[in-house]
Amino acid sequence: MAIWRIINRSYLKYASNQLTRNYYTQVCLASSTHVVKQTTKLSSFDIPNSDICTRPSNIFQNLRFLATSAQTRKKEAEVDSDGPRLNEKITGDYVRLVSEEGHCVVSLREALRRAKELQCDLVEVQRDAKPPVCKIVKYSLELYKKAKVGKERAKAKRAEAIRPDIKEIRFTPKIEAKDLKFKSDQALKLMESGYRVKCLAVPDKDKHKELEPEKLLELLFRFTCFIGDALVESWPEADRKGAVVIVRHAKFGPPKKGGVKLMKDIDIKSARVKEESPKPDSSKAGVATVDDQEDIEKSEPRFSVEQAQPVKFQNAYAKREPSSEFSGGRDASRFEPQSPNQHVNPQRPRFSNQAPNQQPTGRFDPQSPNQPPSAPRPQFPNQQPTGRFDPQFPSQPPRPQFPNQAPNQQSTGRFNPQFPNQRPSPPQSRFPDQAPNQQPSGPSPNRHPDRQGPPPRFQNQAPNQQPTGRFEPQPPNPPRAPPRPQTRLPNETSNEQPTAPGRSSGPASGYGIFSTPKTK
């Protein structure tokens, strides 16, 4: 009976728990369909015999674990492929430690302790072994040694191949034996490095002359005696500008083209000498050589002083007729010599007022004294003649310049006012030996008697007026009489104030309209 009661109680509790769980799930679904916001919190404390929290779902965890296993393996492989693992990156409880004394199996912790004491790294040498093999070394030093070995291998491999570049060594005949030996050592080093060497013998630059090819070849073979074991790649050649040969080291093998030939086996006579291009014949070009000049001097006839004749040159203009441009000009006589009995045609005048046979000379052409003077043209509209007058002809009297001037009076360059009661002063003579009223007997001594003054250059200019270049004042109207002093009548009173005995009669000092009179 007791057992039955226990079973009924447990069954009733289980049934009640199932009913309450179904009820809550239906309420949640109904609230979601009607879009009603209700917060229902189900807790395991409210449902003591609930199995929701006690049953973990491992299905999704197992699926995630299966998906990431392949990815983790790839990452580990990438890390391991970079290089050996060091120190703490080594996995495993035990390792086989290799040293100079031998090898033994120790724990990983013991191997790390030993590496730390020696200040080195614990490097995993073989990972696939069980247990993995490790070694205590300095990892940075091992990397340096490995890189150095790689460089040496690359250098040795490069030294086995010939380089395409060509190095050149040049020397001149004035080089000494020790310098020639030094250059040969340089050539050997270059050939061992894989270069082909071009040996060039050239003449001295300071002498500026070319040597014979045989001398340059002799100098070249003196140099090649120091490198006799070298292979000849290009056969020796020589000319007046230099001798050249190209050699290479024997360890690189013979060249592809041509046979094997050592430098020491080559004879100097077998070298090729370039022929010079023929020079143009100097006799055909019109240039005489030294031998030709000697022959000319020997064959040249020698004349005595009596037989000497002047050298005649051919006149290129003897048979040429002058053009019409020079037929009537002043240069016609330069091209056509005329005999004294030959009739001369009148020349065409170059100007409108020129005589038929008159030669134009320059700016001023003198005229004969019997020719009448041309009409004067004033320079300016209101211009009067200047004070200086040079008579053109002896019989022509000068004209007065001013209305009150005497006929024979000479005007000066300045104005002298005269008063009515003053006597007119006699005119001053221009020359020291001339009387006051004496007329000049001839033209000015500075002028030629047969020459006439130049024609006026301006429209209103007088015939003999000289333009001065500066303005000269003209005389105004008749001068006024000087002012007479004022006379004061005896009964006339003055408006002046009497001055004090101690004061002067001058104007009183003040400051104009702003000054105030002083009151006593």
UniProtKB/Swiss-Prot annotation:
Composition skew (Basic and acidic residues), residue ranges: 271-282
Q: Mind listing the GO molecular function terms for this protein?
A: translation initiation factor activity
Write down the InterPro entries for this protein, in alphabetical order. Answer: T_IF-3_C_sf, T_IF-3_N_sf, Translation_initiation_fac_3, Translation_initiation_fac_3_N
Any one Pfam family match given in the protein's UniProt record, by short name: IF3_N
In residue numbers, the region (Disordered) covers: 271-520
* GO CC annotation: mitochondrion
Chief site of localization: mitochondrion
The places in or outside the cell where this protein is found are:
Mitochondrion
Q: What is the extent of the transit peptide?
A: 1-66
Keywords noted in UniProt: Initiation factor, Mitochondrion, Protein biosynthesis, Transit peptide
Mark out the compositionally biased spans (Polar residues): 336-361, 404-422, 458-468
Bias class Pro residues marks the residues at 369-379, 473-485
Superkingdom of this protein's organism: Eukaryota
Described by its record, this protein's role is as follows:
IF-3 binds to the 30S ribosomal subunit and shifts the equilibrium between 70S ribosomes and their 50S and 30S subunits in favor of the free subunits, thus enhancing the availability of 30S subunits on which protein synthesis initiation begins.
| Similarity comment | Belongs to the IF-3 family.
Subunit structure, interactors included: Monomer.
Q: What name does the UniProt record give this protein?
A: Translation initiation factor IF3-1, mitochondrial
